[in-house]
Amino acid sequence: MGDRKAIFITGGGSGIGRAIAHLFGQRGWFVGVGDIDTAGMDQTLSAIGNGYTYAHKFDVRDRAAWDTALEAFATAAGGRIDVVANNAGIPLGGSLSENSTEEIDRCIDINLKGVLYGAQAALPWLEKTAPGSCLLNTASAAGIYGTSGASVYSATKFGVRGATEALDAEWAELGVRVRSLCPGFIDTPLLEHAPNQQSNEAIRDRVRAAGLEITPVEQVAEAAWAAVHGERLHTLVGQTARRLAFGARWMPGRVRRMARATARPLGQ
């Protein structure tokens, strides 16, 4: 087994995954990225430029592809995987009545089932580098309190938080850490997308119109580093996430009233 620690990151072709890859690469780790976007992965890894990198094209919805990807990455990294970052995800906004069955299935399959498949595939590798190895799941502030106009997305992120808590307990005796990141709106290319097939409005425009904070993606990467090396189960990223968590815990009635008063689906 090699001496250099190794991290494999899904959704590594852009956004949060790219930022995490860059930070860990700068700090001497062997970095692997998985994505369906080959060009994006190449751009991510070219910026690291130390030769200790690997890219693997695959779809997180394919359970068998997970095994192939992690086996190939471990081979490239000298036989070890210390961290698997379950980061691949897609947005979905709009009222539930407007979301197509295809949109709902795709969001659940990528955001939740993909995370569970990744956890299942990662465990044998993380056991080998325990204690201290880590499964890092990207959840969301939408998994802290249900987000109006993003019910399906919110449900998937609640699922990711729940899976993180369950696996943290299940794997504790194995020495494998399980952590989640709960960011608010992050400055990534996803904000340029429309929230669903019925809308032409970019998510970024909707966020700005609501007066909400957009957090630099580099802050998420630093939070990922802290989560992997720390004891906090859920790491909140950005003021929106922290305020929502505080309100949901200490002022749930007020948060509920505000959610009702400001309810407007992202796609409208």
Provide a role label for each language-model segment.
Residues 95-96, 100-108:
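Substrate-binding pocket helix/loop in short-chain dehydrogenase/reductase
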Residues 13-14:
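Conserved glycine-rich cofactor-binding loop
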